[in-house]
């Protein structure tokens, strides 16, 4: 899978998360969960970018694994925001779908990199 696609999707997702943060802060007057989802949702792309310039395959796997965990945390905050009526089901489903797709792409990249490591001599 092209790393450029993942880079672009994670940036677009981060933009959506920033917009959600602004909506929650300004419209719903919510401050705690919005900061949590802002941190985790924008961290996904930041870790992907760091991983793309990793110093070693192990560093790549580590950065992408952190991005994977941040996706998981973001999914938690999205679900909580939906279940507490801060976001609509439509907003939730749309963001959840994007985040889940990102997580699958990240997981696929990790698996591919691990497989390539196992095929490389001396690893």
Where are these regions (language model features)?
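Short, C-terminally biased terminal segments at protein or domain edges
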Residues: 1-123
